[in-house]
């Protein structure tokens, strides 16, 4: 016999499950803009902000877990889509002692070409001073695959005998930038070995008022055993927030040389899009990450991956280290401001 109440319960149950799934995996992350620092105007603790933070962390964990178990483990292949992606893929790549002769080695060239074409924007670390020829050659390699990329290169940074040059490459059909807004963070007290490189980007191809705009910071920190550069990240972020552009979406990409839970900034609402994934060829160390502020950068889609080029190219750990002591990695973001696709 038909029971209308039983049918109604099933419908309500299905609706509740669908709503919970949408909230967990699809809805933009929530933020309490009235009290952005977990404190009310009278100084008392804001439990609403605490609940929002906990909810956001749960949803990001759920999205990362889903992405991990549903993404293809197959290395980047020839059949992967090369056209405009609705999502923006931001990567970080550290190639030790990178210069033109090293870039031209077959396996290094293949890694940078393959990883380059799979990302819309890459923060590059490890390049030796005055090596813009590497960037020109890299762009030319991508152009042979009908991909239009540009680059931004910073000045040499570091101390005598220990210098680097940071750079970005970006998909010009997907992103625009303002070269006048490219700058190296000033460090008059010489507290950090390699001064971070800061750039501004906006997604192209959609209404500029709806396009995701953000600041990307390229950085390479020293091992915590030899310094306390990780403790400077909050001050670095604050300096960038006050640079006159009023950009709320700040993304830090590069080498942090420690697990995300050991980065003080990540105890204050920031998170690493790679979670606790190892990022060295031996899969023992947490060296690299992409950090975002979970309460302001709602555009993060909950997906971050490390490119295991050892498996992709059938290399030993020692062979891989000759290419890089770091594994490339990326995170995916919505192309639209606020995370709506």
Write out the residue ranges for each language-model feature.
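Active-site beta-strand/loop signature of hydrolases that rely on acidic residues for catalysis
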Residues: 90-95, 112-136, 169, 216, ...
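Active-site neighborhood of phospho(di)ester-bond hydrolases with catalytic His/Asp-centered motifs
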Residues: 123-125, 152-155, 251-255, 272-276, ...
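Structured beta-strand-rich core segments of catalytic domains in phosphoester-bond hydrolases
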Residues: 70, 130-208
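Solvent-exposed loop/turn segments at secondary-structure junctions
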Residues: 95-100, 127-132, 156-161, 173-176, ...
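Beta-strand-turn-beta hairpins that frame and shape the catalytic cleft
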Residues: 81-90, 173-176, 191-219, 338-340
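Extracytoplasmic, non-cytosolic globular domains
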Residues: 199-277
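Metal-dependent phosphoester-hydrolase catalytic domains
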Residues: 2-74, 240-248, 258-341
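Acidic/histidine-rich helix-loop elements
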Residues: 87, 92-106
């Amino acid at each position: 016999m038909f029971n209308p109440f039983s049918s109604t319960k099933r419908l309500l149950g299905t609706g509740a499950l669908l709503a919970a799934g949408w909230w967990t995996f699809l809805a933009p992350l929530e933020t309490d803009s009235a009290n952005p620092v977990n404190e009310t105007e009278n100084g008392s603790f804001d439990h609403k902000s605490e609940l929002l933070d906990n909810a956001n962390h749960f949803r990001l964990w759920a999205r990362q877990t889903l992405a991990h178990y549903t993404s293809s483990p197959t290395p980047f292949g020839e059949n992967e889509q090369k056209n405009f992606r609705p999502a923006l893929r931001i990567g970080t790549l550290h190639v030790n002692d990178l210069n033109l002769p090293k870039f031209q080695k077959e396996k290094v060239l293949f890694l940078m070409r393959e990883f380059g074409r799979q990302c819309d924007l890459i923060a590059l670390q490890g390049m030796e001073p005055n090596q813009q020829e590497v960037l020109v050659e890299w762009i030319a390699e991508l152009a042979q695959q009908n991909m239009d990329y540009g680059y931004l290169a910073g000045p040499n940074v570091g101390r005598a005998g220990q210098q680097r040059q940071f750079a970005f490459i970006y998909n010009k059909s997907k992103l625009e930038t303002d070269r006048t807004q490219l700058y190296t963070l000033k460090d008059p007290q010489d507290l950090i070995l390699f001064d971070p490189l800061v750039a501004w980007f906006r997604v192209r191809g959609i209404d500029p008022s709806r396009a995701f705009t953000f600041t990307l910071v390229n950085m390479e920190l020293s091992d915590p055993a030899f310094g306390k550069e990780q403790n400077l990240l909050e001050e670095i972020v604050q300096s960038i927030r006050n640079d006159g552009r009023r950009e709320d979406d700040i993304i830090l990409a590069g080498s942090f040389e420690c697990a995300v839970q050991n980065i003080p900034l990540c105890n204050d609402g920031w998170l690493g899009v790679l979670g606790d994934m190892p990022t060295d060829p031996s899969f023992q160390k947490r060296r690299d990450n992409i950090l975002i502020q979970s309460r302001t950068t709602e555009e993060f889609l909950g997906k971050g991956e490390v490119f295991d080029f050892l498996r992709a190219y059938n290399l030993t750990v020692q062979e891989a280290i000759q290419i890089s002591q770091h594994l490339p990695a990326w995170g995916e973001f919505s192309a639209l401001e606020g995370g709506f696709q």
